[in-house]
Amino acid sequence: MELHITPALALLREHHLLDHVSNLTDFTATSVSYDSRKVKSGTLFFCKGNFLPKYLASAKEKGAIAYVAEKEYPEGEGLPAIIVNDEQKAMSLLGAAFYGYPQNDLFIIAITGTKGKTTTAYFADHILAQSTADHIALFSTLDRILGNKPEDKFKSDLTTPESLDLFHDMRVAVDNGMTHLVMEVSSQAYKKNRIYGLKYDVGIFLNISPDHIGRNEHPTFADYLHCKEQLLVNSAKCLINAETEKFTDVYYTAKATTQPEDIFLFARRGANIELPDNAQIDFEYRNDLEDLHESEFELTALTEKAKQLNLDGRYKTSVPGDYNEGNAVAAIIASGLAGASANDAVETLNHVHIRGRMEMINSNTHGTIYVDYAHNYASLKRLLAFLKRQTNAGKVTVVLGATGDKGISRRPGFGKALTEEQPDEVILTTDDPGFEDPMTIAREIDSYIDHDKVKHIQFEMDRETAIKKAIDGSENDDIVVLAGKGEDPYQKVNGEDVPYPTDVKIARDYINELER
């Protein structure tokens, strides 16, 4: 891989990003990096994010050939300085160019939504693995899968990687023979221009509800919605859950850049939806069976363009929850648009396991434990409502906390969800407190709970102890919900990632200890 200065500057000019160049020489970069620790001879270095000038000095010492920044730095004296008006946009464009535009060799399905992205991504990944004979890459909150060998599978750091990492991983996937990619796209990826210039074959919009609003994230819900909608603007075909909040706004955003024949809408049968203009629901689904182990639903095409995909049928999923049926429907339709058949979905959906998403742990005498990433009002409410419908006897205990430094709206949201669904017991605990006091966060959540409806609330800031307390207090017919962290193997505390065994491991180990 390499990038010559002449086409690089032309690309920046084309997108009106180039301000000026100092110390221009004729060079070809043989490496790109925003991390000074990874710089080697011939590297084009990007000064981004929480940049400190000493990083540029280090990059220069290690052999950086030039740097890209929004201003010149004395530490880069003597190096060609490519000065741009938006560092993140420039890095995305030049990263794609350096890696030879690998996105052009992939059929890309991109997924956004406040909740359900990871579940939908795994459903689609399994369907397409069947239809493409395992030529499918996956970029999710949990994993980055670039090929079929063990060394091609990694745990993810971000829902959507930094642009240089994203295009590097796409290049590796293409070189490994992958033909399709399923990727989650976060609102922050658009807010921070990590994916500027990237286009998708199919863009899925699952839902939107208040989340990620606060300092260090989105200043308003309108900004959050706008960033989510950018996925549709950049997709050749758009697939929208018509039951989402702000549906009319979302639909018109898609329609502004996409022909009506390339917009597909789906909804649960009987859903109360106001359709704008001449919009039609293309697919509807209805639940046939739901329990604590699986869901079964029927999918029906209603329009001619939908019928051409031949996806009508009955499907089972191994991930329980009626709300996950909508995620499965999105995956089925998107995979159909990528060439998969109904049979590909039928054969795979009932064998999908997603770590930390409705993960069930059985015990002999301490009830059933569910570990789920539910981390906002909408996801917690839907999870508790589903479990209550499935529970004929016994109590429900919820263990949760809220993150510090961001997502402030989650705290009243948790209080509201708990008040509405009225679990029998709640243990408020720690969940990535950052630079905030976890007890202060817990008491803020508690302040939004109606104590006439939720009477039994405890505070236990050691999350492992909180989980053990919940299990200790449960009997055979009870349910314990461990919400918010899923499979996260760390707690973010005072700027550090402190290792954490994961909710799943703590629960399993403790049950084994109690029942051996």
UniProtKB/Swiss-Prot annotation:
UDP-N-acetyl-alpha-D-muramoyl-L-alanyl-D-glutamate binds at residues 36, 159-160, 186, 194. One of its GO terms (biological process) is peptidoglycan biosynthetic process. InterPro entries: Mur-like_cat_sf (IPR036565), Mur_ligase_C (IPR004101), Mur_ligase_C_dom_sf (IPR036615), Mur_ligase_cen (IPR013221), UDP-N-AcMur-Glu-dNH2Pim_ligase (IPR005761). The keyword Metal-binding does not apply. Pathway: Cell wall biogenesis; peptidoglycan biosynthesis. ATP binds at residues 113-119. It is an enzyme of class 6 (ligase). Pfam families: Mur_ligase_C (PF02875), Mur_ligase_M (PF08245). Its main location: cytoplasm. GO terms for cellular component: cytoplasm. This is UDP-N-acetylmuramyl-tripeptide synthetase. It comes from Limosilactobacillus reuteri (strain DSM 20016). The lineage of its organism: Bacteria, Bacillati, Bacillota, Bacilli, Lactobacillales.
